[in-house]
Every structure is written in C-alpha cells, then in structure tokens.
Amino acid sequence: MRTWYDNALNVIWTEAYPNMEQTMQMENKAVYLDPFRYNEFEGFNSHNHIVVTEVGDGTSVVEVKLVQESLNPLGMAHGGLIFTLCDVATGVAARTGGRITVTLDSNIHFLRRAKDTEKLVARGRVVKAGRTTGLVTAEVFDDTDKLIATADMTVYYVDENTYTDSAAQK
C-alpha cells in the first residue's frame, strides 16, 4: 500500500530525475542481466563516469576516467569512488551468470594512493557462486597497471520475482 509519503517522494524523484522512471521499470529482466546495458542508464554510474568495458564468464572490467570531482582534497582519487568502482565490477561479474544481485557485505583494502593517473580500471571475478550468495573479488589498477586496491564482496542473489510489477506494488 502506497502512502502519501511514497507519492510525495515519487513526485520529487520524477522532477529531479526525469529518466528515473525508465530506469526503474523492470519489465524487461534482460536489461538488468546484460551488464553492458548499465552504460545506457543515466544514473549513479554515469554520473561518476563509470563505464563497463568488458564482460566475460564470471568476470568484468570497469573503468572510470578521473575528473576534478573524482578527487579528494589531497588530489587523489576519492576512496568512495574506488569503493564504488569495486562494487560495480563485482556486481557486473556476479550478474554474468544470469542472476540479479545486490551487495550484501564488503571489505576493501586501499594499498596505495591513486594520484597522477587519468583513469582507474577495476577487474571483477566471481570466486564462488552459491545458491543464495556468492563471493566476488575486485582489483583496481591505475593507468600504469599499479595495484591500488582490492575488495571482497559478498553478493546476494535476488529472487527474480522481486522486481516484477506485482512485487513492486506490495
């Protein structure tokens, strides 16, 4: 049951993000299982210049070109951006098995600063895909192929009916 608050939020989001309705409509499950389609959505990833560049069986490569807004006050790539890059890389790798996932738990290790680099590249890889959860790792490299960070993510495989219209209305 929708409340007045839900309706108010819907109006605010629709005005602030006119393409959000297109993104939120999950009539075609294939869109969400095709990792390259992420590049088409005007959402968080595109706002942060994150692009999926390669997808394999349980693997992914995701890149971000650094811009001024990507940097922290010390002139290095912001840790939150590096974490987000890992989250996207692991999510894309986990989805190559044809299942919808969300991040359940995460652990990141920042190994060196990401300074004086034009882009960061994250490589995601599924370590284990279980019945309801999976373990996926990511490594982030600068443009000279130096290892910047590593991350381990536990993903939850979402029931395919979660995003149907009838489930969304409950």
Regions from the language model: what does each represent?
Residues 2-170:
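Terminal targeting signals and extreme-terminal segments of soluble enzymes
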